[in-house]
């Protein structure tokens, strides 16, 4: 959709919900932009798992998910994080609604081939009809990063991946991947632009690692699949790192 902006909120979503964030949202709405949010919640999921004495394990920046971890993830994302986000919008009289994969089968997913990750999936289809209907009524949609497979089983989905799939399905003009750092760093320096063709080299040389690996892979997918621009940053008001489609920089 033209004029659609997708924003992925970081794992500590409340850190992103500053007054500057809401000012930018209202400015975009005044300019007839349509806003979709996909939220993470990793920080809160980890805290709940620790409180319940459930071991926390990650692999290549993704959470290893067994049945207990999946139940905690669903509970925290849908029951804690998402309502906190929608309430913050409602306090500012901004129309908003929270959605998850069970709403009209919003996010279809298949389990990843890496069985070591457990019940972790990849989005295979985004049913955009409901999102588009809500956006046409100027209602911001807030989506939890979970998927449901063909057997109607829930799967944990990386929030960056989910945001990129949603942005691509909507042909968004921009995707902001908000995180806890102001962009992709090489040492202490923020990299202004990265071509998708350069990402593999940056990974092999250790410039990107940990959670930034799946984040950049997702950003590259979005840049190559119909999203106008992809920005990794800690704030809607900062320039961050732009991910460009294929063409090498410099």
From Swiss-Prot:
GO terms for biological process: arginine biosynthetic process via ornithine; L-arginine biosynthetic process. Pathway: Amino-acid biosynthesis; L-arginine biosynthesis; N(2)-acetyl-L-ornithine from L-glutamate: step 2/4. GO terms for cellular component: cytoplasm. InterPro entries: AceGlu_kinase-like_sf, AcgluKinase_fam, ArgB, Asp/Glu/Uridylate_kinase. Its EC number is 2.7.2.8. It is found in: Cytoplasm. Keywords: Amino-acid biosynthesis, Arginine biosynthesis, ATP-binding, Cytoplasm, Kinase, Nucleotide-binding, Transferase. It catalyses: N-acetyl-L-glutamate + ATP = N-acetyl-L-glutamyl 5-phosphate + ADP. Substrate binds at residues 41-42, 63, 156. SUPFAM superfamilies: Carbamate kinase-like. Pfam families: AA_kinase (PF00696). The record marks 8, 215 as: Transition state stabilizer. Coiled coil: none annotated. One of its GO terms (molecular function) is ATP binding. Belongs to the acetylglutamate kinase family. ArgB subfamily. HAMAP family: ArgB. Catalyzes the ATP-dependent phosphorylation of N-acetyl-L-glutamate. NCBIfam families: argB. This is Acetylglutamate kinase. It comes from Listeria monocytogenes serovar 1/2a (strain ATCC BAA-679 / EGD-e).
């Amino acid at each position: 959709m033209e004029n659609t902006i997708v924003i992925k909120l970081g794992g500590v979503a409340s850190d992103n919900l500053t007054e500057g964030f809401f000012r930018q949202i209202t400015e975009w709405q005044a300019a007839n932009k349509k806003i979709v949010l996909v939220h993470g919640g990793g920080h809160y999921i980890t805290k709940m798992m620790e409180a319940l004495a459930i071991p926390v394990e990650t692999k290549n920046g993704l959470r290893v998910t067994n049945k207990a971890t999946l139940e905690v993830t669903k509970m925290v994302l849908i029951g804690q994080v998402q309502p906190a986000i929608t309430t913050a919008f409602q306090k500012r009289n901004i129309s908003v609604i929270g959605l998850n994969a069970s709403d009209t089968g919003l996010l279809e997913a298949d389990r990843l081939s890496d069985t070591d990750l457990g019940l972790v999936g990849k989005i295979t289809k985004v049913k955009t009809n409901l999102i588009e209907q809500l956006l046409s009524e100027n209602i911001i949609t807030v989506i939890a990063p979970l998927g449901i497979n063909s057997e109607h089983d829930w799967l944990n989905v990386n929030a960056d991946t989910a945001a990129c799939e949603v942005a691509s399905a909507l042909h968004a003009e921009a995707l902001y991947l908000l995180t806890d750092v102001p962009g992709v760093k090489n040492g202490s320096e923020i990299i202004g632009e990265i071509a998708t063709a350069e990402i593999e080299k940056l990974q092999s040389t250790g410039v990107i690692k940990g959670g930034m690996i799946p984040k950049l892979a997702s950003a590259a997918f979005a840049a190559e699949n119909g999203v106008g621009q992809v920005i990794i940053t800690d704030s809607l008001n900062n320039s961050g790192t732009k991910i460009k489609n294929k063409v090498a920089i410099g």
